[in-house]
């Protein structure tokens, strides 16, 4: 069936966007989609009725945003999208001057040159290690709809984040504290996969038909032993909870491609069959986000009514907002 992307446009009031993170993540709210019941996230473990398998994305947001001044005058911002090798990276570049191949920039702490120009991004060659640049000069990149404030940075990574190279957080995990994870681990199994979230996650759909939208590509990896646990859970009819759309896309890709690592541009549409997950926990997504296609898939045509209900109930949306739990019917 052909779907129009205008189905995924809705009115999101500015005051429904949580500009500030929950200082205590357990104070956030959880909407249980099936019953429309709203609970405090701290009580999440109480609704897990039988031993289950939980899949989290542990990819860590790196300090990829570098804001500095050119020695010649004027500010400059470099946003590292992905590292090619020790000294080369694909980046976004914000500077008032004309950007041409071969142009060199000098700053107090580092220098770089434009080696190639892509569609909206640049291949930059730096005179210092990019890892050193990230560690010494980088800032956490907050989403474009969140007002930048360094006091928010420490709340934008999950408590279990480790490894990987994400430039945006898999934010469904932000609701989980170490205490809640420990409580879940008593009767359930927890595994961590890796999907490196890239900046394409924020790009709204700009075509008329859903099938014409090209979703962003992201690197993923799953340990062999952990995928074995997923297979065992399916064989035993043990419920599987994917925490976040990135976890869902990674495990579905691994299943369909019979590959535990690689690059995925898997686009879950309303009529796509979901093979692995029984439940999806996710935040509320922005209008025209391709992720709303997943919401449409797991909840049905009335997903927008559920979103209206969440807004009317005072729930908060987007990265620092509240969460919703979907039961995925076969």
Please report, for each region that a protein language model flagged, where it lies by residue.
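Surface-exposed, charge/polar-rich loops and edge strands
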Residues: 1-330
């Amino acid at each position: 069936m052909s779907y129009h992307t205008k189905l995924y446009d809705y009115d999101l009031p500015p005051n429904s966007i949580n500009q500030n993170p929950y200082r205590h993540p357990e104070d956030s709210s959880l909407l249980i989609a099936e019953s429309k019941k709203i609970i405090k996230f701290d009580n999440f473990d109480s609704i897990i009725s039988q031993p289950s398998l939980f899949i989290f994305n542990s990819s860590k947001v790196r300090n990829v945003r570098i804001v500095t001044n050119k020695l010649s005058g004027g500010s400059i911002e470099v946003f590292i999208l992905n590292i090619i090798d020790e000294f080369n990276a694909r980046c976004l570049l914000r500077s008032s001057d004309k950007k041409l191949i071969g142009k060199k920039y000098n700053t107090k702490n580092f220098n770089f040159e434009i080696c190639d120009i892509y569609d909206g991004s640049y291949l930059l060659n730096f005179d210092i290690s990019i890892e050193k640049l990230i560690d010494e000069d980088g800032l956490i990149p907050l989403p474009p709809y969140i007002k930048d404030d360094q006091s928010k940075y420490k709340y934008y990574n999950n408590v279990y984040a480790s490894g990987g190279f994400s430039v945006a957080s898999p934010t469904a995990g932000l609701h989980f504290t170490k205490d809640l994870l420990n409580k879940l681990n008593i009767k359930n199994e927890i595994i961590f996969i890796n999907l490196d979230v890239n900046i394409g996650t924020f790009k709204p759909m700009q075509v008329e038909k859903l099938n014409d939208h090209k979703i962003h590509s992201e690197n993923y990896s799953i340990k062999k032993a952990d995928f074995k646990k997923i297979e065992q859970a399916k064989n035993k009819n043990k419920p599987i909870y994917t925490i976040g759309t990135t976890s869902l896309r990674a495990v579905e890709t691994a299943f369909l491609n019979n590959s535990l690592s690689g690059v995925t541009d898997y686009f879950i549409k309303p009529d796509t069959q979901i093979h692995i997950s029984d439940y999806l926990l996710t935040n509320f997504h922005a209008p025209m986000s391709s992720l709303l296609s997943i919401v449409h898939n797991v909840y049905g045509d009335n997903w927008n009514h559920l979103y209206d209900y969440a807004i009317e109930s005072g729930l908060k949306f987007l990265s620092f907002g509240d969460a919703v739990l979907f039961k995925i019917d076969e």
